[in-house]
Amino acid sequence: MRLNYLPSEFQKALPILKKIKKAGYEAYFVGGSVRDVLLDRPIHDVDIATSSYPEETKQIFKRTVDVGIEHGTVLVLEKGGEYEITTFRTEEVYVDYRRPSQVNFVRSLEEDLKRRDFTVNAFALNEDGEVIDLFHGLDDLDNHLLRAVGLASERFNEDALRIMRGLRFSASLNFDIETTTFEAMKKHASLLEKISVERSFIEFDKLLLAPYWRKGMLALIDSHAFNYLPCLKNRELQLSAFLSQLDKDFLFETSEQAWASLILSMEVEHTKTFLKKWKTSTHFQKDVEHIVDVYRIREQMGLTKEHLYRYGKTIIKQAEGIRKARGLMVDFEKIEQLDSELAIHDRHEIVVNGGTLIKKLGIKPGPQMGDIISQIELAIVLGQLINEEEAILHFVKQYLMD
């Protein structure tokens, strides 16, 4: 198969391929970028594979950086662009079900493509737009099938993260997982316990944000892979509820909203504890916890200015989005109205600070100072006090007298 045209992302990198070929070596575009152009999807990273060994690649180009030379990757800096060039390679027995014990550089494109995970990721594209398809990936693209390259059991035993990648690709591409490949996923699902939590989180997070995330979640459940992910063991009913509770066309706006929705469906009591098991950042934990908190507040009462001030409009709208997806009453207009009525959105917007209170009223630093500023803040938020120095100082004097 030959492409009628090369997208601009490939066009920019063509001089790199031609330079390598001029030096007497083979060079191809490989990986997900080739798959995406065949599916008419946006292209992100353009990867180049070559028969030249790393030291040979470095001799071809003037400016290079060793970004992963032990794995055959050299970063080439050329005409304002950066290109990762990786030598064809084979891999020895994997350790920890993730990393090869040894990488061997080879001159054969076929040997290199054999080690890829799925047939639709095992294409190569030459400078003339010809697609090299050694594993019937084009047929799988046409049939919307995700199939492992070679023996599926070997691929997942080599690198168990491929199980999560497969589920994620199913969710992003709307592909069914080929039967033998799926059975191998189920067989090797327990190996996910050997994979770093951070890597599993990245793949699961991408799955949740994918346009066909429901397909990916169903495959996650059917494969029993969830049993080997943090905090999800034996939670099939809750994961199924996660799907059934949301409108079938609902797409998550953010990672934070997706994980908040999952946590709500699983009836997790302590959000931060749950997310710490996934080794997420404290900032992420805080935002997810706030979305969950707002959702639970909304189960008890309507929104107030104080809620808007404390959590912020972005967090509250995401919680309201989950309510809408669950078929509950929502009021986005009220959120906008309350937000517009707030005199301040942050404590730093108060015209008086601790220094002013020390200078004008002689209040000493300490717990009392913090309490006074909190009272000022609340009164302004509730509309009981205008954000002007004279009014605030009068308020403080009255507060101290009471």
UniProtKB/Swiss-Prot annotation:
Cofactor(s) the record lists: Mg(2+)
Top-level lineage group: Bacteria
Statement: the UniProt record of this protein carries the keyword RNA-binding: yes
Positions with a binding annotation for CTP: 32, 35, 116, 159, 162, 165, 168
Stored HAMAP family: CCA_bact_type3
Function: Catalyzes the addition and repair of the essential 3'-terminal CCA sequence in tRNAs without using a nucleic acid template. Adds these three nucleotides in the order of C, C, and A to the tRNA nucleotide-73, using CTP and ATP as substrates and producing inorganic pyrophosphate. tRNA 3'-terminal CCA addition is required both for tRNA processing and repair. Also involved in tRNA surveillance by mediating tandem CCA addition to generate a CCACCA at the 3' terminus of unstable tRNAs. While stable tRNAs receive only 3'-terminal CCA, unstable tRNAs are marked with CCACCA and rapidly degraded.
Extra facts: A single active site specifically recognizes both ATP and CTP and is responsible for their addition.
Name by which UniProt lists this protein: CCA-adding enzyme
Organism: Streptococcus agalactiae serotype V (strain ATCC BAA-611 / 2603 V/R)
